[in-house]
Amino acid sequence: HARAKWLGPMPKKGDSCMTKRATCAVAEKSGARAYNSAMLIGPNGLIAVYRKAHLFSDEKNLFSKGNTPFEVHDIGGVRIGMMICFDWFFPEAARTLALKGADIICHPSNLVLPYCPAAMLTRCLENRVFAITANRIGTEERVKGKPLKFIGQSQIAAPDGKVLYRASEAKEEARVITIDVEKARNKNLNELNNIFKDRRPELYKG
């Protein structure tokens, strides 16, 4: 998956809550298996690993299906969940993280389909969470004769479905955005509708 580039030194003790935490995607080897994984890293090292649940296209020939649940981790009072790339196509991924209390969904990606930037706005709106999608730019030919072109457009999206920042399609960018996580904890749309309390899971079974 995407190679991780450090934007600065590794986190160290004494750093503020979110300034020295990092999420990156890696190819993880575990025994005889390989997983498309995301790591959450903090001042004391590795916090958590999530293994991609939904493999896309030729990834099925390279990686095993992820066997870790969608979990939420408290980082200095901010609740972080992770999903990877094509996981966005399955609404259950973001909904599970939201139901477990995520304020922010970290979403490292190698997106080649054009739909995700707009779709993630819906994921944020329907779950009232923030989402940070970090995507690649450029091209790569993993399988001979089948080049991949990445769409760029890394973005930060808000619980109201609005784009706080979206990067370009063709150049590397870094941006710092200040958010209020309390907006992700208010699940009320109006005086009468709460998106979680109004759920009818008894009617949703397939």
Model segments located where?
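Active-site catalytic loop in hydrolytic enzyme cores
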Residues: 29-100, 109, 115-122, 150, ...
